[in-house]
Swiss-Prot record:
It comes from Vibrio vulnificus (strain CMCP6). DEAD-box RNA helicase involved in RNA degradation. Has RNA-dependent ATPase activity and unwinds double-stranded RNA. This is ATP-dependent RNA helicase RhlB. A motif (DEAD box) lies at residues 165-168. The gene is rhlB. One of its GO terms (molecular function) is RNA helicase activity. It is found in: Cytoplasm. Component of the RNA degradosome, which is a multiprotein complex involved in RNA processing and mRNA degradation. Its EC number is 3.6.4.13. The lineage of its organism: Bacteria, Pseudomonadati, Pseudomonadota, Gammaproteobacteria, Vibrionales.
Length: 435
């Protein structure tokens, strides 16, 4: 697959440590995205940064590159023990922490830098063993990091680089006290390289930067519109009775390679999953009640393509780096305007195009005016013909066993006017290799 770049700035021309450049090249990264092109020269000069960029524009690679380069070009503190981290990367959710770790591993494979994870919902002993084996870069959620700190597994006296990712989300989830607890146990701000990245640089985020960073430079990559010009947005006004049939019909028409379907409640997500599973779709469910191991497995299946549809609450809307999501369905319009932007930001990433389809139903249409005011444009409306919707929906299931039911072969077309109808053959069942 051809990689798309958005600037002409090459990583190799930034003066990075050769080992960092080698890691980037092995992963196919040659050109910078705008946030990388703006942030990296500042960070390489030793200046702290508070960066704002639209979701999916490469913030993670920017701070990982800067962190690894700083560790490779700056001597460790004299007397530091191998179990004492030199850099710490804080994330609001365990899913994001895992994604950052997975992105980091191939970049440091040949550098000698050791990364370790610390997050809740996973074996304490397993993570402890990893930390006791030595750690340079600690990646995790604040709660588990504090747990290990209070158990004296490590101290923060040798921290030379700090990353706070999704800072606005940290506030939303109530983690600011934890963040301040950790900052106050590190060396003074001027003795470390500090990086804060956020989808928005609100007043409270800027205040946090002022308190715990050393004269950070603000770097902002302002999108042409908040939702991204590569995302095709579409809005329907279904009745509550038509919503499920409309969703299934649009899925049959669009035939997305990889789609996320968002709903506002765990109960609604479970209901959507049950209907789609009954109809033979390869669908996963991601809510706050799903155990961590299962969540990781579902995300792995979705990323690798053995699951085509992911039904999720907003737990999946922020921070997860899932490549090549072609469609996002807002089954429910979110109550928070920013969540709309973060949801549809799962598609149209890194130069690719994407399609967002939203339902303004009887329950959530009230949220639309505030969303459109926030994104500063109206969402194009499409009509649908209720008589063209799928009528023979099977009864929802509660277990994955019914996923093998045979798919229907023709659904007609739900959209009115000149919109395309579904004339594609049904997707062939996935071929399983024989043992």
């Amino acid at each position: 697959m051809k990689k798309t770049h958005i600037t002409e700035q090459k990583f190799a021309d930034l003066g990075l440590n050769p080992q960092v450049v080698e890691g980037l090249e092995k992963k196919g990264f040659e050109f910078c995205t705008p946030i990388q092109a703006l942030a990296l020269p500042v960070l390489l000069s030793g200046q702290d940064i508070a960066g704002q960029a639209q979701t999916g524009t490469g913030k993670t690679l920017a701070f990982l590159t800067a962190t690894f380069n700083h560790l490779l070009t700056t001597p460790a503190h004299e007397g530091r023990q191998p179990t004492q981290p030199r850099a710490i990367i804080m994330a609001p959710t365990r899913e994001l922490a895992i994604q950052i770790y997975n992105d980091a591993e191939p970049l440091i494979a040949s550098t000698g830098i050791k990364a370790a994870l610390a997050y809740g919902g996973e074996s304490y002993d397993k993570q402890l063993t990893k930390l006791q084996g030595g750690v340079d870069v600690l990646i995790g959620t604040t709660g588990r990091i504090i747990d290990f700190y209070k158990q004296r597994v490590f101290n923060l006296n040798n921290i030379q680089a700090v990353v706070l990712d999704e800072a606005d989300r940290m506030f939303d989830l109530g983690f600011i006290k934890d963040i301040r607890f950790l900052f106050r146990r590190m060396p003074a701000p001027q003795e470390r390289l500090n990086m804060l990245f956020s989808a928005t640089l609100s007043y409270r985020v800027q205040e946090l930067a002022f308190e715990h960073m050393h004269n950070p430079e603000h770097v902002v990559v302002e999108p042409e519109q908040k939702t991204g010009h590569r995302i095709q947005e579409e809005l329907f006004y279904p009745s509550n009775e038509d919503k499920m049939a409309l969703l299934q019909t649009l899925i049959e028409e669009e035939w997305p390679d990889r789609a996320i379907i968002f709903a506002n409640t765990k109960y609604k997500c479970e209901s959507i999953w049950a209907h789609l599973a009954a109809d033979g779709h390869r669908v996963g469910l991601l809510t706050g009640d799903v155990p961590q191991k299962k969540r990781e497995k579902i995300l792995e299946q979705f990323t690798q393509g053995s699951v085509d549809l992911l039904v999720a609450t907003d737990v999946a809307a922020r921070g997860l780096h899932i490549p090549q999501v072609t469609h996002v369905f807002n089954y429910d319009l979110p109550d928070d305007c920013e969540d709309y932007v973060h949801r549809i930001g799962r598609t149209g990433r890194a130069g690719a195009s994407g399609h967002s389809i939203s339902f303004a139903c009887e329950d959530y249409a009230i949220n639309l005016p505030a969303i459109e005011e926030y994104i500063e444009h109206t969402i194009p409306v499409s009509d649908y013909d209720s008589s063209a919707l799928i009528q023979d929906l099977p009864a929802p299931v509660r277990t994955p066993s019914a996923r093998n039911q045979q798919r229907r072969t023709n659904t007609g077309g739900a959209r009115s006017g000149d919109r395309k109808s579904n004339n594609r053959r049904p997707r062939q069942p996935r071929q399983h290799k024989e043992a």
